[in-house]
């Protein structure tokens, strides 16, 4: 059995009804997350090089998931820089296995190169959090002349925005079904006309060819 105190485990659950009541009461005058207070939204930006693939992963969590994870985020003292850095490192490593990258059907493992966690103002005086993970394939990986497939298997049970982009850096991406530019600004500016029907792209495929750019 875990040695974590029962009160520490139960606190987020006990706070949730109060949080929901506060958000409902203040909703008309507060700025809510554009996709809803329960959403967990993700963006993967692929940058393909001749001998490596980089993944820029961003996870944007709305107010409810944030307060469940960090009930102290909006209390005096809040979340310390050390706590934020520790969570970011652990969470990026936990998400890494769910990012499936293959070249000609062979899976290429990713390693986390950097991680960051930021808290931003949300609705009713609560925070939302933005997790950023920079990942890269391990060692030298020849990409040219191969079919690349990428699948984000994380958060399959969550509501939210899912977006993947892909660009070539010293290579050309042929028949890519991923856009070259993020239409949400990496989850910072969601298009108003898509708020009721969020983008739900969890996979991308393309052919890597000699050149530079997307064909």
Language-model regions, residue ranges each:
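Intrinsic disorder/low-complexity segments
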Residues: 8-11, 26-31
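Generic N-terminal leader/targeting and pre-domain segments
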Residues: 3, 16, 28-30
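N-terminal secretory signal peptides that target proteins for export/translocation
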Residues: 1-9
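Bacterial N-terminal signal peptides
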Residues: 12-25
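N-terminal soluble domains immediately following signal/targeting peptides that reside
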Residues: 29-215
């Amino acid at each position: 059995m875990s040695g974590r105190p029962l009160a520490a485990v139960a606190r987020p659950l006990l706070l949730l009804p109060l949080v929901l009541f506060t958000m409902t009461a203040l909703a008309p005058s507060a700025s809510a997350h554009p996709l809803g207070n329960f959403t967990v939204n993700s963006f993967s930006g692929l940058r393909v090089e001749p001998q490596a693939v980089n993944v820029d992963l961003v996870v944007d969590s709305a107010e409810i998931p944030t307060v469940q994870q960090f009930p102290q985020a909006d209390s005096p003292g809040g979340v310390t820089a050390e706590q934020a850095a520790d969570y970011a490192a652990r969470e990026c490593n936990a998400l890494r296995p769910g990012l499936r990258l293959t070249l000609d059907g062979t899976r290429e493992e990713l390693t986390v190169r950097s991680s960051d966690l930021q808290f931003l103002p949300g609705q009713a005086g609560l925070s939302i959090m933005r997790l950023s993970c920079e990942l890269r394939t391990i060692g030298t990986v020849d990409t040219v002349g191969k079919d690349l497939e990428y699948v984000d298997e994380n958060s399959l049970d969550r509501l939210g925005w899912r977006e993947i982009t892909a660009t070539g850096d010293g290579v050309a991406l042929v028949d890519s079904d991923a856009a070259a530019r993020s239409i949400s600004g990496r989850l910072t500016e969601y298009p108003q006309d898509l708020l009721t029907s969020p983008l739900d792209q969890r996979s991308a495929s393309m052919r890597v060819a000699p050149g530079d750019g997307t064909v």
